[in-house]
Amino acid sequence: MSTRSQSESPVDAPQQGATNGQSASDIHHSGDELLLSADSDIAPTLSVVMPTLNEEGGIAQCIEWVKAALEDMQIYGEVVVADSSTDRTPEIAAENGAIVIEPDGKGYGYAYLYAFERVRGDYIAMGDADCTYDFEELPKLLNMVRSGDADMAMGSRLEGEILPGSMPPLHEHVGNPLLTKFLNVFYGAGVSDAHSGMRVFSRDAWETMDCSSTGMEFASEMIMEAGAKDLEIKEKPITYHPREGEANLESFPDGWRHVRFMLVNAPGYLFSAPGFGLSVIGVLALVLAWSGVEVGGAQFGIHTGIGGGLLTLAGFQLMLFGAFSTVSSDPVRGASDPFTTWFTERISLERGATIGSVVLLCGLAYGGLLAFTWVTSGFSALPIAVADVVATVAVVIGLQMVFGSFLLGSLGE
């Protein structure tokens, strides 16, 4: 057969067996015929990628499921196994028609990154090779992407059926729902099962996501990137099956890696939002203490002022951290709160240093006035006033802003 410039289904392609008036669309191809080898001249429509680490008990069944899906859809496809096994997984995969590659690095994410660079299909599917995902359910996911209804289609285990013994109760009722909530709030993913491993997406969507994580957090990064870049994600319920072989997942270490990755890539939620909240509470406490008003019989004096000053300083420092993180680390979703946006986009080194210097000088001027009063009073003890706390806060914030502007300037160069 001649090489084709783009992927095509058998019903669209000229067939050698279409004789005696038989049209190409009348020919039904088996899954074995539709699963392409590495040296095939036909461009596959779908590339199915499976990372494997000692999955000899399940790899053959997974490939058979893919063949059944290809036969159901009557499209050409390939199975690419990114293997790091020490058992017979690669031999079994090759015997069943898969293209076996060996990543030159370690990690769940790296296996996918390595494989995605080498697939040939216009559409890419991913899933584990331990029989937990039935690849015969691929058609309903691929159809959503091919029709343009979604950039990425995911199989939802939590909206579908989880067979007994398939998922630990802690994962089903705590871990996965909690991590999904994080991703939905921080990145606007809008999904029910953010860590489902069965996904289908277009090549264009993959290039848009621009993922780079090499560990287990790769699964989170895909959703984070898709949500942050406004890709359309849709789900279909799927059935989750008991796995074949030993599990490679470490619940708490892997779960923490997901949480850590989500937080450090959302400085607005990690730093700016709590910083803004603390600052508002702190300033409110300072105002109440300075004004001397009573609320419900409660008096707000110097102790309230000291607490308000500490909260204001802590909040301002956290908001600076949000600005520094946004500029220095290029997070998936940078902080978009008013302070960070203003500080990173409107404040140059010179302007920030100038504003900080003015605030600093105001605080120092009041401090100088206190010192003068102390000297002229014969070095007698002076009562602590809320205004003293405000002046101290002004000095510290001024210093933070001056040197923070220089740091931000150096990070931005």
From Swiss-Prot:
InterPro entries: Glyco_trans_2-like, Glycosyltransferase_2, Nucleotide-diphossugar_trans. Residues 16-25 have a biased composition (Polar residues). It is a multi-pass membrane protein. Residues 1-27 are annotated as: Disordered. Its main location: membrane. It comes from the Archaea. It holds the Pfam family Glycos_transf_2. Pathway: Protein modification; protein glycosylation; Cell surface structure biogenesis; S-layer biogenesis. SUPFAM superfamilies: Nucleotide-diphospho-sugar transferases (SSF53448). It is found in: Membrane. GO terms for biological process: protein glycosylation; S-layer organization. Belongs to the glycosyltransferase 2 family. Hexosyltransferase involved in N-glycan biosynthetic pathway that takes place under low-salt conditions (1.75 M instead of 3.4 M). Participates in the formation of the tetrasaccharide present at 'Asn-532' of S-layer glycoprotein Csg, consisting of a sulfated hexose, 2 hexoses and rhamnose. Together with Agl5, mediates the addition of sugars 1 and 2 to dolichol phosphate in the tetrasaccharide. This is Low-salt glycan biosynthesis hexosyltransferase Agl6. It comes from Haloferax volcanii (strain ATCC 29605 / DSM 3757 / JCM 8879 / NBRC 14742 / NCIMB 2012 / VKM B-1768 / DS2) (Halobacterium volcanii).
